[in-house]
Curated annotation (Swiss-Prot):
Binds 1 zinc ion per subunit. One of its GO terms (molecular function) is succinylglutamate desuccinylase activity. This is Succinylglutamate desuccinylase. One of its GO terms (biological process) is arginine catabolic process to glutamate. Pfam families: AstE_AspA_cat, AstE_AspA_hybrid. The active site is at E229. Signal peptide: none annotated. Zn(2+) binds at H70, E73, H166. Belongs to the AspA/AstE family. Succinylglutamate desuccinylase subfamily. Its cofactor is Zn(2+). The gene is astE. Pathway: Amino-acid degradation; L-arginine degradation via AST pathway; L-glutamate and succinate from L-arginine: step 5/5. It comes from Burkholderia thailandensis (strain ATCC 700388 / DSM 13276 / CCUG 48851 / CIP 106301 / E264).
């Protein structure tokens, strides 16, 4: 049996998981107990940490919470490190199996979005051809960790969750919004109610399979998965974490088996209808450099030109999300969405 003294000494680094990760350090032990021996933990590698109640059962939910897939999106990383601390001290009771993932430690240490390639476009095996990319082995490691974690999870609807937390490069009409991956199944009321609890203002529904971490866990691991965009990119230590309080509380409620007593309104919904794809470095994007996400444009408005390629708004109104002319040729330079709130809410499963 692990003594209290040994357990406390070996787990002291859990007070600042972020500091250990930024230092590229290794904990003195790779497994142990915390929270007065109520929780088992395992360090699975750089930025990867698994918790499990000592009395865990197969009926428990399995929850993956990730942040730092983009290394400069610091606020969710800081929140996740504090979540680890509070679980370790027993301040936050754990009522699920939990995998914590700091997505791109190399980019976090460099203070960059990524080192060679956007990690959140390398999942679903898209990392395989990129032999020289420093992100490619990390994508493979995250896929393997998620697959192993969910392999022993329950299979009931809602038994598997993945919350991938980000912040955005630009401002947004809706400061905090979520993206749901396309799986071929209708969105669930369970997820929408949780997003409402997190006070997420809008949800973007993808209509094609993608290459993000949440797409991978939804499609391959059968998780209820979402990507959260929680505000603006800021350096470590410069975040006003109070702005993320509702989302943080919702994550904490999820892992501790609690629910917000106040029934929140469901978020508005926007569905992807098209995208602007960068054909070449000659791409011209006819929107202001700092245009907020979800800015609306009227039918007929020319938004992009790239050689013979043109994109003009086809619907009565379309909103642009993630406009970025600086991506590599062949990648998405912007998404176009239309509002589908009423139809989506009516069809929730």
């Amino acid at each position: 049996m692990i003594s209290s003294a040994d357990s406390g000494r070996d787990a002291a680094w859990l007070d600042d998981f972020l500091a250990l990760t930024l230092a590229g350090g290794t904990p003195p032990a790779h497994a142990g107990e915390c929270a007065a021996h109520a929780v088992r933990w395992r360090w699975l590698g750089d930025g990867l940490l698994q918790f499990e109640p000592v009395d865990a059962t197969r009926r428990m939910q399995s929850v993956l919470v990730s942040a730092g897939v983009h290394g400069d999106e610091t606020a969710p990383i800081e929140l996740l490190s504090m979540l680890v601390r509070d679980i370790a001290h027993g301040a936050l009771p754990l009522r699920c199996r939990l995998l914590v993932a700091l997505g791109n430690p190399g980019a976090m240490r460099a203070g960059e979005r990524y080192l060679d390639d956007d990690l959140n476009r390398l999942f679903g095996g898209r990392h395989a051809p990129l032999a020289t990319s420093r992100e490619a082995p990390r994508a493979a490691q995250l896929e393997a960790a998620a697959s192993a974690f969910f392999a022993t999870a329950g299979r009931a609807r809602g038994a598997r969750w993945h919350i991938d937390m980000h912040t955005a490069i630009r401002a947004s009409v809706f400061e905090q919004f979520a993206l749901l991956p396309h799986t071929g199944e209708p969105p669930t009321r369970t997820m929408f109610e949780w997003l409402g609890e997190a006070r997420i203002a809008a949800v973007l529904l993808h209509t094609a399979k993608g290459s993000t971490f949440s797409h991978f866990t939804a499609q391959t691991c059968g998780a209820l998965a979402c990507t959260l965009e929680l505000g603006k990119v800021m350096p470590f230590g410069a975040n006003d974490l109070s702005r993320f309080a509702r989302a943080d509380a919702a994550v904490r409620n999820l892992v501790s088996g609690r629910r917000d007593a106040a029934r929140a309104a469901l978020p508005r919904v926007f569905t992807v209808v098209d995208q602007i794809t960068k054909q070449s470095d000659a791409l011209e994007l006819f929107v202001e450099k700092d245009v907020p996400n979800f800015t609306p444009f009227a039918q007929g408005t020319l938004l992009a030109r790239d050689g013979d390629y043109r994109y003009a708004v086809r619907h009565a109104q379309e909103r642009i999300v993630f406009p970025n002319p600086s991506v590599k040729p062949g990648l998405r330079a912007g998404l176009l969405v239309v509002e589908t709130t009423l139809d989506t809410h009516a069809a929730l499963a």
